[in-house]
Regions:
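Pepsin/retropepsin-fold aspartyl endopeptidases
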Residues: 1-137
Length: 137
């Protein structure tokens, strides 16, 4: 039997009757910070947010990096912008996307922009998400 040891700096809890949802902060500059609740989605390639957050952060939505995102239910257009993303006390600069659709239903924390910056542990039975900044050591 192999022993694997992981350590985490933070532990976040989420609601038993909801998806794995965490509170984050997005900022476009030091004076603009927005609190957002978002779903952790290991199947999503990108972090994708509802479009009104782009406007609250001062972005011109369509001046971002345009991508066509495909899902099992169809596809949609989103625009990428550089932000500072904060979860707990962990912070980094990254590219996230804002959906073009006004009625985009959910904010998503995917592999690119979120999970690729963290080591995570999930104990769903206890509704706990353990996180630590990713480093190569």
């Amino acid at each position: 039997m192999s022993d694997f040891l992981l350590s985490f700096s933070d532990r976040l809890s989420y609601d038993r009757y909801d998806e794995v949802t965490v509170g984050i902060l997005l900022s476009s500059d030091p004076s603009t910070r927005i609190a957002i609740e978002a779903k952790v989605d290991t199947g999503s390639r990108f972090c994708i947010f509802q479009p009104h957050y782009a406007f609250l952060l001062g972005f011109d939505l369509e001046k971002g990096v345009k991508v066509n995102i495909r899902t099992a239910a169809g596809s949609f257009i989103a625009y990428g912008h550089e932000v500072t993303l904060t979860v707990s006390d962990i912070e980094w600069d990254t590219l996230v996307y804002f959906a073009e659709m006004e009625n985009f239903p959910v904010n998503v924390l995917g592999r690119g922009g979120f999970l690729d910056h963290l080591r995570i542990g999930l104990v769903d039975y206890e509704q706990l998400l353990y996180i630590n900044p990713y480093d190569e050591t």
